Design a protein with these regions (language model features):
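Nucleotide/phosphate-binding catalytic cleft detector across ATP-hydrolyzing
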Residues: 1-51, 56, 68, 104-127, ...
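Short loop/turn microsegments at loop-to-beta-strand junctions
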Residues: 58-60
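Short glycine-rich, Thr/Ser-proximal phosphate-binding strand/loop in the N-terminal lobe
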Residues: 63-102
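Segments forming glycine/polar-rich beta-alpha architectures that bind adenosine-containing cofactors
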Residues: 226
């Protein structure tokens, strides 16, 4: 939508729409600056890491050895929030209600906990109980991406901005804290990093692709999101 002298923006009441973004000129360039944590680098580290892609329908996880960047295992699962609706809009409308939001968030953290355990299970040391528990702390870092709606639900955010134009996310920077404060159990000791969206419904999954492509050798690269 383009604002003109006869058509003021209903959001900021201006014809040049310098504020809310509902109306924008066609030649308007939009830049987003996202600050990554200092340790968010492709450098060797001790322990295990997990990456999750949280989709509306499907959840995907990968277990990594942070020491040599080798893939150890992978796991997929169905997003249990489907009982609240199978499409993004239905899910957001459900999450906008206070009585649903915490249930939906816990459904997701419980499922990701379960997937993490299934991936780590083959590598758990056998023997005394305390030795088995020690492997839980081997999971040092968990990076979570996904579409904007699923990430906001995971963070327990009331997704008001995504339900109306100009579809502005309610979080715009990386969220990082211990798993316990996110509500995780198996992953309670890990550093959880939730990447932010690029903007609107262009989510953290797209940002992850960009971050990876940016680290590749120079050349033409085609990224396809189906």
């Amino acid at each position: 939508m383009i604002a003109d002298k006869k058509n003021k923006c209903p959001g900021c009441k201006r014809t040049d729409c310098g504020g809310c973004g509902i109306y924008r000129k066609l030649n308007t360039n939009k830049q987003v600056r996202i600050q990554f944590p200092p340790d968010f680098r492709a450098e060797p580290a001790q322990g295990l890491g997990i990456s999750f892609d949280v989709g509306t329908t499907t959840l995907a996880g990968m277990l990594w050895d942070l020491g040599n960047a080798s893939l150890l295992d992978a796991e997929t699962g169905t997003n249990p929030q489907a009982v609240f609706g199978t499409d993004v809009i239905s899910r957001l409308q459900a999450a906008a209600k206070e009585e649903n939001r915490e249930k939906m968030r816990k459904m997701l953290t419980d499922k990701l906990d379960e997937m993490a355990f299934q991936m780590v299970k083959p590598f758990i040391r056998t023997g005394r109980e305390e030795e088995e528990k020690a492997t839980w702390t081997d999971i040092k870092k968990v990076v979570i991406v996904g579409n904007t709606a699923m990430c906001e639900i995971l963070l327990g955010i009331k997704p008001e901005g995504l339900l109306k134009a100009p579809f502005t996310p309610d979080y715009k920077q990386i969220r990082q804290r211990k798993g316990k404060s996110f509500g995780f159990s198996f992953l309670q000791n890990a550093d959880i990093i939730v990447l932010p969206p690029i903007g609107g419904y262009v989510g953290a999954d797209a940002l992850a692709v960009y971050h990876y492509v940016n680290s590749c050798e120079k050349g033409k690269i085609l990224a396809v999101d189906i």
